[in-house]
């Protein structure tokens, strides 16, 4: 899968073109298996939890690098019982992850086609009936839609091309996870 950017360009919008080119050549056209891992533990007080982003495997090659060792502290709004607003709420984090994933996909594609971005942002919104959440009942019908707006700017690029570029974000992994029904398997370990 070739990149149409000039061979003289080493970087587009902060993305190193030789590394991007090598990545696309390595993954080829076939299926690419990417295994991701996260571990979340309750912090023993209120709704505080800490998520640890672990190693990943790409095509069976496990990457255990310090660069993949991130921690996210979660909590809920201070207005909720037992909460101190010491970190983002889990649903807000999903919305933020969606925006970040759309930006990643759009920025990579922009670099791939040689578009130098000046601005790129995503605003994500969701409304839902929280009654099911508070009553601990089936909430599947309480979530109706997630909406997002992409703001994109690049000099010397037509509005049509920018619109096409912004639509690439719909193919990001988080968009796909949220927009299709997916099997969620659970295992309960009681100690």
Language model region names:
Residues 1-96, 106-191:
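Extended beta-strand/beta-hairpin segments
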Residues 98-102:
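Alpha-helical metal-binding/catalytic segments enriched in His/Glu/Asp
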């Amino acid at each position: 899968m070739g990149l149409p950017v000039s061979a003289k360009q080493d970087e587009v919008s902060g993305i190193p073109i030789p590394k991007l080119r090598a990545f696309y050549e390595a993954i080829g056209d076939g299926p690419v298996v990417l295994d991701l891992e996260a571990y979340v533990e309750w912090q023993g007080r209120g709704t505080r939890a800490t998520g640890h982003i672990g190693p990943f495997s790409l095509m069976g090659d496990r990457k255990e690098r310090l660069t993949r060792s991130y921690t996210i502290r979660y909590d809920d709004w201070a207005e909720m019982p037992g909460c101190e607003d010491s970190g983002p709420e889990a649903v807000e984090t999903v919305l933020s992850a969606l925006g970040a994933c759309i930006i990643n996909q759009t920025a990579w594609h922009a670099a791939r086609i040689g578009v130098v971005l000046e601005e790129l942002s995503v605003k994500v919104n969701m409304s839902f009936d929280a009654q099911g959440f508070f009553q601990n009942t089936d909430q599947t019908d309480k979530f109706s839609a997630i909406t997002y707006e992409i703001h994109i700017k690049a000099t010397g690029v037509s509005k049509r091309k920018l619109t096409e570029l912004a639509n690439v974000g719909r193919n990001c992994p988080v968009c796909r996870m949220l927009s299709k029904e997916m099997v969620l398997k659970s295992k309960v370990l009681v100690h």
